[in-house]
Design a protein with these regions (language model features):
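Domain-terminus/edge residues, biased toward the C-terminal soluble/receptor-binding domains
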Residues: 76-80, 88-93, 97-231
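Active-site-adjacent loops and short helices of periplasmic peptidoglycan-processing enzymes
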Residues: 1-97, 104-108
Length: 231
């Protein structure tokens, strides 16, 4: 259903019993959507992901179907999701390229919520937890996005940073420790921000070509950019 940041969702026993990292929601009580979002982003709360999934779609399975449909709309062609938390399952998978597309979509489509990813800590029920993203604690322009870890996949991270109005999204995965994840992601972000530049190929409202028109009033029509074309 439609939710707002102020909406309150009931915590099911399934969510409360969920293993792994937790936000520590309490079974039978309600939690605010904004708190749950922060619990997922900052605290890596597997329990919070299930509360949100059930609130949005009724069940976690139904949410996974919605998730797969949405993933396809943003070009994630080699991913399949069967749960909300990323809990290990042979049918739950993605690729570095797809995860980079997800990161870019988060930044582009939901700028009003992206600031949550830069929060270094969050307190819920008097329990304060630090953000696990190591990039946030290094002065290299990072402002997100999300860590991940399972025994099968190793330590991973979708990271992002901005410098001189130029944004970089990076993905690392399969690293053998949190320390290795921190070092490799930091190295990649610093390198990318120093060694790549944005180039403007066409300014907004520029005529870039003429297209032939068949049986029209004019023989050609101008192709004009709506916005700056950069890469």
């Amino acid at each position: 259903g439609d939710l707002t940041l102020e909406s309150e969702l009931m915590v099911s026993e399934k969510a409360w019993r969920m293993g792994g990292s937790k936000m520590f929601v309490e079974v039978g009580k309600k939690a605010k959507v904004e708190d749950l979002i922060r619990g997922v982003i900052v605290q890596s709360g597997n329990d919070a992901t299930i509360v949100l999934a059930e609130g949005l779609a009724g069940t976690e399975d139904a949410f996974a179907k919605l998730l797969n449909n949405k993933a396809k709309t943003i070009g994630m062609e080699n991913s399949n999701f069967v749960n909300a938390s990323g809990w290990p399952d042979e049918n739950h998978y993605s690729t570095a390229r797809d995860l980079s597309k997800l990161g870019r979509a988060l930044i582009t489509n939901f700028p009003e919520y992206y600031s949550y990813y830069a929060e270094e800590e969050f307190t819920y029920s008097d329990i304060t937890q630090k953000n696990r993203n190591p990039l946030l604690y290094r002065d290299i322009g990072a402002d997100g996005i999300k860590t991940g870890h399972t025994e099968a996949a190793g330590y991973g991270l979708i990271g992002s940073g901005v410098q001189d109005e130029r944004r970089v999204v990076l993905v690392v995965n399969g690293l053998d420790s949190a320390k290795a994840r921190a070092e490799e992601s930091s190295r990649l972000l610093e390198w990318a921000l120093k060694n790549f530049d944005n180039k403007t190929f066409f300014a907004a409202n520029a005529t870039v070509a003429q297209a032939d028109v068949t049986m029209g009033k004019a023989s050609t029509v101008s192709l004009v950019t709506q916005e700056d074309v950069m890469a």
